[in-house]
Amino acid sequence: MCRVRYADHGKLRAETHIDEGVTGMIKELGITVLSENRAGARGLLAEHGWALWVEADGRKILFDTGQGMVLTHNGRKLDVDLSITDDVVLSHGHYDHTGGLDAVLAEACRPDVYVHPAAFQAKYGKGADGVARSIGCHVRSADEVRSRSGNVVLTQLPTEIVDGVWVTGEIPRRSDFEDTGGPFFLDEKLTKPDPLVDDQAMYIESRKGTIVLLGCAHAGLVNTLDRIAELTSRDEIHAVLGGMHLHAASEERIERSVEALERHSVRVLGPAHCTGRQATSRLWARFPDRCVECPTGSRFAF
């Protein structure tokens, strides 16, 4: 059963409580949305971005950092103290997930930053006018992160942050109907496609089951969920929250993504950020009692 409460009378409170109980690694898990495309309560700000504050048995983890325009503001409004951040996980190297890294490094005391080395590469998108635009992380190396008081953990392979909390590392691209959702490029001339090998997800073994946090799922939603099921040796996934980058997806890809969510018995589904209107509408129509909203200020307790 999923009970949702959103902001009421201007109070900054938006919570989702998951009530089923299954024994797992993390006994107390709370997740707060700090950056998303929509604001969920009076006084909060929105941006095209994604950032989650994760509290796992006392461990404070920031999953992505948004563009950086709303992170500290929303943190203050939501009583999230970024200065006590233990770990930062970057799902990939795009600006709307890494832009707040400077602010976190300035406030926190040497957090561990979990990131794939390719996230520091120059990255470009193609604008509507056909002109290249830079969409990468402004921090261009692990050494630069270290110089700004951050410890760096490179995550090509699955990496455990703390008991029960993992970063997937690189995700194998096995499906023949998924792509990065681009076009994305590694050069300003737009001649070298970016395979986004840096794309990764975080998953948590909670009392309720496996909780999956996505950045944009550029590796493909199906590839990502299948990889996590492989890593946990369990097909069942309790919750999936985050961007799924299906805004330009084909009908086949959307339908097969829906089938994968059913196959993995996902009980709580929070399509957010870059999922896209068509795909989000399809997910809410197919899973009306499993879907939850994820604007800034939303809180989830598992």
Give the label of every model feature segment.
Residues R38-A41, V70, F120-A122, R173-F177, ...:
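Short, acidic Gly/Pro/Ser/Thr-rich loop/turn segments
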Residues L29-L78, P195, D199-L214:
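Conserved beta-strand hairpin/beta-sheet module of binuclear metal-dependent hydrolase folds
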Residues F120-Q200, R263, V292-F302:
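Metallo-beta-lactamase
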Residues H94-H97, D112, L190, D194-V212, ...:
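Cap/insert and terminal regions of metallo-dependent hydrolase folds
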Residues V54, G75, H92, G164, ...:
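Divalent metal-coordination and catalytic microenvironments
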